[in-house]
Every structure is written in C-alpha cells, then in structure tokens.
Amino acid sequence: MFRMWGKIWKDNHLLKDTVVENDAKDTRTHKIFQALEEICYDFDLGKPIWLSSTVSEFQRHSKTRFRKDSFIEEIPFDYLEIQVIEEDDFYDL
C-alpha cells in the first residue's frame, strides 16, 4: 500500500493534515501525483508547481515543502508539506 501525508503549516504550527492511501497497481510517480491532487482537493487548494528544488528534495527524502512560490494563487499559510509514509513492496508490483 502507498500512503502519503499532507500537512499545512503556518508559524511552525500544524493547521491541517490528511493521509491519502492508494492500492492501485500503478507507478510510484503516478501515485505521487494522484495523492498530491487528492490532498489539494481535501484542502481546497490549487495544485502546486514542482520547482527543481522541490523535485530534488523529494527525490532524496520522499518529502518536500511547497511554499508560496509554488502556488499561483495567494495562500494563507507558510507551506504545504507532503511526505511518503508507506511504499508498496517491490515484490507486490
């Protein structure tokens, strides 16, 4: 099972969080984008733009932060953080 945790932070306080699960037989990349889309839907946000810094941070740590410069519209928080908390087993694919 693939699980991603989405969190909204402001002034070092957690305002909202949600966990998205995905059991589909799909690539990791597709699961990440689908989970991010669901997190943004739950939080009523537009989808953030993946900057080179967010991509490289996510590739290294399976975790990244989308700050104000990643969103087209104004956001009332400091950043949206996403983190993969459970990966599919390689042998299950």
For the regions a language model picked out, list residue spans one by one.
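Generic structural motif
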Residues: 11, 23, 85-89
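Short, extreme N-terminal segment that most often corresponds to the first beta-strand
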Residues: 1-21
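Acidic, low-complexity intrinsically disordered segments
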Residues: 35-93
